[in-house]
Amino acid sequence: IPWFQRRGIHNVTELAWWEESSLDTPDGPARVVALPARHWARRSLIADARRLWASWALILPSGNAIYFAGDSAYFPGFAEIGEHLGPFDASLLPIGAYEPRWFMQTAHMDPDEAVQAYADLGGRGTFVGMHWGTFRLSNEDPLEPPHRTRRAWAARNYPGEDLWILRHGETRTRRLTAPPPRNAGL
């Protein structure tokens, strides 16, 4: 929190995994839930893993919910998140920076694992592929992740219109419909 305060940002809430806070919206309070992820945190050359890394759920007053995986490897926690809060109307999942697997598998999922994570989260709604093609962080071709994700998606027979891999700078919107029956929560 001091980092934010030094920069003039004072309305900050720090959460541990499975803790939640609320965010005021014109339609009422939205729930913001900090959730597990599999990665590490480093904020300087010498301070390794002193801060918690997280994924997030945003549950709107309407009941619609969005999941943001952040930077994460695949791990069994996706199924637990899906059990408690899924399915989601949109899931933003990383699809890049995964080769070589022997080195990257503890920090970044590959496209097949991202589609598995989507299934674990409830397998419904829009899958938005992220964390690819901006910086060369690993050994795969920077344009490979979208192709591999589309193949993994098709192998599960998910609807093509639910897979969004945006071009750089692209914007899309999707009208949220009534939320699906959702698990009870925490």
Across the structure, where does each feature detected by a protein language model lie?
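Helix-loop-beta element that forms the nucleotide-linked donor phosphate-binding surface
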Residues: W3-A16
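A short acidic, glycine/proline-enriched capping/turn motif at secondary-structure boundaries
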Residues: I1-P2, H39
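Core dinuclear metal-dependent hydrolase active-site scaffold
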Residues: L15-G86, R151, R167-L186
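A short helix-to-beta-strand connector/capping loop
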Residues: G8-N11, G28-A30, Y158-D162
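Cap/insert and terminal regions of metallo-dependent hydrolase folds
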Residues: P2-W3, A65, A73-R167
